[in-house]
UniProtKB/Swiss-Prot annotation:
Its EC number is 2.3.1.286. PROSITE patterns: SIRTUIN (PS50305). It comes from Mycolicibacterium paratuberculosis (strain ATCC BAA-968 / K-10) (Mycobacterium paratuberculosis). It catalyses: N(6)-acetyl-L-lysyl-[protein] + NAD(+) + H2O = 2''-O-acetyl-ADP-D-ribose + nicotinamide + L-lysyl-[protein]; N(6)-succinyl-L-lysyl-[protein] + NAD(+) + H2O = 2''-O-succinyl-ADP-D-ribose + nicotinamide + L-lysyl-[protein]. Zn(2+) binds at C112, C115, C138, C140. SUPFAM superfamilies: DHS-like NAD/FAD-binding domain. Coiled coil: none annotated. This is NAD-dependent protein deacylase.
Length: 237
């Protein structure tokens, strides 16, 4: 069986990673998300944007994969599994999943905003949240930015291409913890359905996908995913 997993913020929220809408420590609560996650916000105040992302980087480093992440990784022993994620954390990888296609980038990868060269140098230490942090500087003189897809930016070509390939070849797509409103990622479930794959939605809340999904499970990832692989044949018949 070939399984494509599309994961969103809900699965990581169970590990203590705030969702994007909640991911603002008191220092940044007064800022609109656009100010912290856009090229315009970066141009206006790169120190503030860097401070916010560096705080998120260290926050995620301190949490652990949950039962949902571990279940998906365990499926690899019984099926061909590809993970497509809208999340910018590394919890799928730490649980053991391979491959993982990050559609929106990663909090653990950085690049020069000017020349795009990847940055693997030291990061500023952060014992506690700081409103503004000076970004590292590339050899070309450009500032180092998080390798994250900001508002208005295109998805990275290679992860998107591989996500589409995994979706097109899947027998089953499991959509977990995503609102199903952020495109183009939300269109992957529609693509899977159009190609005859079963789409299983795992989400405590009703989403725009719920009406068309083959099966909707109103549970969290850590509740539904352990044991789901063994239950799939009966659930889908």
């Amino acid at each position: 069986m070939r399984i494509a997993v599309l994961s969103g913020a809900g699965i990581s929220a169970e590990s203590g990673v705030p969702t994007f809408r909640d991911d603002k420590n008191g220092l940044w609560a007064r800022f609109d998300p656009y100010e912290l996650s856009s090229t315009q916000g970066w141009r206006d105040n790169p120190q503030r944007v860097w401070g916010w992302y560096l705080w998120r980087h260290y926050l995620v480093a301190d949490v652990a994969p949950n039962a949902g992440h571990r279940a998906i990784a365990a499926w690899q022993d019984h099926a061909e599994v590809s993970v497509i994620t809208q999340n910018v954390d590394d919890l799928h990888e730490r649980a053991g999943s391979r491959p993982v296609h990050h559609l929106h980038g990663s909090l653990f990868e950085f690049r020069c905003a000017r020349c795009a060269k990847p940055y693997t140098g030291e990061l500023p230490a952060m014992a506690e949240p700081a409103l503004e942090v000076q970004p590292p500087v590339c050899g070309c003189g450009g500032l180092i930015r998080p390798d994250i897809v900001w508002f208005g930016e295109q998805l990275p070509d290679e992860p998107w291409r591989r996500a589409v390939e995994a979706t097109e070849s899947a027998d089953v797509m499991v959509v977990v913890g995503t609102s199903a409103i952020v495109y183009p990622a939300a269109g992957l479930a529609e693509l899977a359905l159009s190609r005859g794959a079963a789409v299983v939605e795992v989400n405590p809340e009703v989403t725009p996908l719920s009406a068309s999904a083959t099966l909707s499970i109103r549970e969290t990832a850590s509740q539904a995913l352990p044991g789901l692989l063994q239950r799939l044949p009966a659930l889908l018949n």
